[in-house]
Structures are given as structure tokens and as C-alpha cells.
Amino acid sequence: MTSKINFISFAAALGFFFLPWVDFQCSDKSEITQSGFQTVAGGGSLGEEANLKVGDQKNDETRGSLDAALYVAVGLGCVILGLLLAVIGLLGGGPPSPALPALAAMALVLIGLQMKLGFPLEQKIVESYQKTGVEEEVAIIDTSELFAQEKIRIVYCPAIYFELGSLFLPICIAFLAMRPT
């Protein structure tokens, strides 16, 4: 039973990488969204409002022009390795690998760390405002001040929280398995 739950948990964690994680909004209108894979690859999808502004142009500007989120990339590697070990454990029928909770914990910490430090698109927005020169007299040092002045919000979509929850499940299972009976 534990092997099945571990497999489902890691498969779900991999699936949540395809869903939108981060939504960058300006004046409460979605400008760019990024899924987990897009944060790793350095891409993004233009929001509805941005698509109307751009018109018929492809969103090539957001593909490959952003830096990759390295912590998320290593977290994705942990999820893929965990899924592989979960499949081996499921097919082998033996006890679950003790590496599964460690891989889940590592991916959980790395994705959480990336959320805390900010995604590369956030730094790119700050750099673009500094390059365009928001007036030299008004030097905006803090990112939160810039975002407040320009009405920019970074909204984490529910899929990123589901990702963290699915990675937390193997850790909980490991702690429950250690409990004396």
C-alpha cells in the first residue's frame, strides 16, 4: 500500500509541473504565467491582456528569453528520480525505498527556497524597470516598493501548493512508518 501511495504522490508531483505555478499580474490583469516546466526551461505564456496587446505576434519573447529557475530544475530531477524509484518499488513488491522521503524533502525544500528567493522572471521585471530608468532621482532599491508603485503582483497558483502537498505526502508516510506500534 505504501508503494502505491508513493507512486501516486510522485506521479502527481510530476503532473503538477505541467500546470501554471506563477502568475505575474499588472493592475490585476494577467501578463505572464509560468508552469513548473516553463520556470525550468526559462519560458512563459502571455496572459489574456498581454495577448491582446501583442496581437498576432507569437510569444517568442517569453520563450527562451528568461533565466531558468535552477532550484526548481534540481527539484524536478528529484521528482523524476523519486518516480523512477517508486515504479521500481511498485513492480518489485519489496519495501519502499528509504530514498523516497529524502528525495521528496529535497524537492520540497528546493521549490520552497525558489519561492522565497523569487523566480527569475521577477528579477527580469526589476532589471527591465531599472534599464528603462524609472527616473534617476527616484532610486527604487526594494523590489516590493517597485511592485507596489507599478501595481505588479506575483500570484502563486493553486498547482504549486498541490505540488508541495504531493511532495509532503511521502515524508508523512515515512514518519508514520517509523512510529512504534
Q: Model-predicted segments: where are they?
A:
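Compact integral membrane and secretory-pathway proteins
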Residues: 1-181
